[in-house]
């Protein structure tokens, strides 16, 4: 398996759009919809490839922090992971971790933190991945409950 930073050409765009359509069909995240080109443009893109084809991706970009003083000083540059996806048949094999670590190494000259939000329905698995395997720190949670009528 190889991880590489990719440019957003037509081939890469087609791969990312296809993966996001598959992800939306899984119905594993609240509110997730397939990406359009405008959702991806301007992001740094990292691809995981095996056997000549893509099996996962991570994309995001660097921002200056705003209203995040509880974890970093105002204006601190951080890399916001917008999406991290691995095809279902290749999950739990370390690909997501390798994508994350590769991106972290690639952006460390311009960012001081890696930050992400998740809307997954399987929060136990995602917390295990991000907190236990990637050694991230829990920052906040937004929970909901439908009011029964």
Can you say where each PLM-predicted feature lies in the sequence?
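Conserved beta-strand in the GNAT
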Residues: 47, 53-62, 80, 85
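Conserved GNAT acetyl-CoA-binding A-motif
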Residues: 107-119
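A short beta-loop-alpha structural element at the N-terminal edge
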Residues: 1-16
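Conserved active-site alpha-helix within GNAT-family acetyltransferase domains
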Residues: 97, 120-140
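Active-site rim helix/loop that mediates acceptor-substrate recognition in acyltransferases
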Residues: 21-49
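Conserved acetyl-CoA binding element of GNAT-fold acetyltransferases
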Residues: 72-88, 141
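Conserved acyl-donor/pantetheine-binding loop and adjacent beta-alpha core of acyl/acetyltransferases
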Residues: 59-79
């Amino acid at each position: 398996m190889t991880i590489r930073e990719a440019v957003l050409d037509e081939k890469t765009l087609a791969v990312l759009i296809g993966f996001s359509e598959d992800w939306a069909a899984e119905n594993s995240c609240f509110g997730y919809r397939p990406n359009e080109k405008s959702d991806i443009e301007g992001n740094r893109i990292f691809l995981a490839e095996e056997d000549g084809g893509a099996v996962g991706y991570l994309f995001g970009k660097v921002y200056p922090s705003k209203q995040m003083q509880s974890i970093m000083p105002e204006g601190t540059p951080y890399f916001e992971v917008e999406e991290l996806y691995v095809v279902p048949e290749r999950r739990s094999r370390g690909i997501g971790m390798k994508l994350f670590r590769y991106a972290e190494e690639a952006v460390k000259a311009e960012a001081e933190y890696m930050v992400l939000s998740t809307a997954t329905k399987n929060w136990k698995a995602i917390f295990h991945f991000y907190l236990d395997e990637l050694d991230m720190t829990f920052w906040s949670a937004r929970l909901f409950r439908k009011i029964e009528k």
